Amino acid sequence: MLPRVRAWLQWPVLIVAILAGGEIAARLDDLVRYDVPFLAPLDVGYDLTVRDSTTIRGRPFGRFKKVRLNAAGFRGPTVTPAARAGCVRVAVLGASESVVGGEAAGTEYPALMQRALDGRGCFEVQNAALSGFDLPHLTVLWNQWVARWSPALVVVYTTPAFYLRPDAPTYPDPPTGRARKPKWWTPRLEDRAPGEWSLPEVVQKWIARRDIERAVAAHDAGWEYQEVPADRLARYQGDLDSLVVAIRGAGAEPILVTHAMRFADAMRPSDELELLKWQRGTRATGPVVLAFERAANAAMLALGRRRGVMVVDAAARLTGRQEWFVDYIHFTVPGRAVMGALLADSVAALAGRLPPTRALSDRVTP
């Protein structure tokens, strides 16, 4: 009997040893690849964002693996309160489509836009985008933080589908309390565990459909949008207009960018899973998600005409090009390069038309 007990006791010890070995290996990997101290905590939310009395923003000099933020908490070159004489400072406001982590950090489309602009005058691109930020959050971020750094131009690449979430975007209250720094023993091995994406496609589709059905069943009839919700679209238009007014009120000029997606007008079999994933975070059917995207882009173009704001039609250039998207809306490296080049052309053209009092370069060559 005793030998059997000893044999059973070996299993917990073995499991603990395997997990401990995996954790040690993960920390050594981070040390070698990213120069992260072995005993330091590693948390993307804490390491890259900070809460102050007015907003959530990028953490000054934040770093997470390959990501490095500057003194303003932006992804960009060294920054001072004002741009260098004769230089055009360009700020980018957006959500997760505008930032990249992991090994691809540094290949965000704003970084590639910077490279495309380097031979066309003195430009400084500062990427202030934060994952999950909708228009109200971006407006507060602009008013309370980004505007202080006096950009001349502001690229706005916002996510219309946020307006199809169960709760519509609202202007946030000031953050309460400071985020707590994670303990040094917070596991890093968990982040390396394979996620849902590693499952067979048929299983991923089943999970997505199950989640959608559960969400619909948990609400009254009519909760799921069967057509483009006029009130949500109007809210998007109003919030976008408010951001434009705020940017111009601070002395900068906005550049609006229509939102691109992988889905063409004619759906392909390979699109089914990605549309289910996108739909899962909303209260709309798949076709309505796509229709809302197109309606929001049309609304942005109309706003640009009404306000005299430059609108870059990225959707016309990138939408439907499956090879330029890693999922439903996030770009591959080639997609980011196309986006960066497209925006560089527009930024250079607009910079060449603005008066020199806006701290613009006299060497700009559209």
Language model features: what each stretch is:
Residues W8-Q10, Y236, M310, F325-T365:
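Histidine-centered active-site loop/cap adjacent to the catalytic His
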Residues Q10-A25:
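Hydrophobic membrane-insertion alpha-helices, especially the h-region
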Residues I24-P37, P166, A266:
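Helix-to-loop transition at the C-terminal end of transmembrane segments
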Residues V32-A116, P366:
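Membrane/wall-proximal cationic-aromatic binding patches
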Residues R89-L93, Q126, V154-V156:
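Conserved beta-strand elements of the Class I
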Residues T107, T159-L301, T319-Q322, T357-S361, ...:
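Serine-dependent acyl-ester chemistry module
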Residues G121-A147:
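A conserved hydrophobic secondary-structure block that centers on an alpha-helix together
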Residues V146-V155, T159:
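Proline-aspartate-enriched helix->loop->beta-strand connector
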